[in-house]
């Protein structure tokens, strides 16, 4: 117990609770949500839908072996890489239970499946990127995880990465990996009942070695009723301790859908109120709020 306590205190020291966040721009988030949703379209209708949003389709590709698909579009000189996720929550849950392996390029530990897919996307998209033009990445579900790793590669290669927005994104790295890429301009959009960003849950055995899956970036929780909360670091991680069931409910399935995210974000573009996220978790007799 003492070792666990020391480890948790170390995490609190590395990733403090109180950080200053700028108010999220939900019009920007909505634009990224639309692009993430566009990745689920059939290839033949994608260009037309993008044009309706003022976007020009530059390139689209699907990798048959992995079923990973992405699009590269451009609007007002900004390039966006949007990566498709999956609508099958059971497949997501199965893919999350994979060991972390070292990535020699980034010098961090990564989820091996996400890293493999991200390398394929990055290799394929590089010839289509215009040097000097701003780049942003986005994606839903597993696509969000791949979008984060692609953003890491872009940052390492000194591309002008300006924004990363993901929806229902699972964790991709561990504590040291999150610390190394703490400067990544990442905003993670989640819903209250979406369990994908929460798993795998916190394990006392893993936390003793500080080798647990860990999120990076700012977390914006869509609460419904035009309300949202913002968390990060240890507070974001502790949300996972409230998840105890590995069997997704119908409510969880709905909460993970891209259509759910689009509806909640669209409402927040019209009216938004930030509220504190109440974890209802105590540590050493103190409430962590």
Labelled PLM ranges:
Residues 1-9:
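Bacterial N-terminal signal peptides that target proteins for export
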Residues 8-18:
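Bacterial N-terminal signal peptides
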Residues 21-138, 142-289:
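Non-catalytic, mobile gating and regulatory segments of ester bond hydrolases
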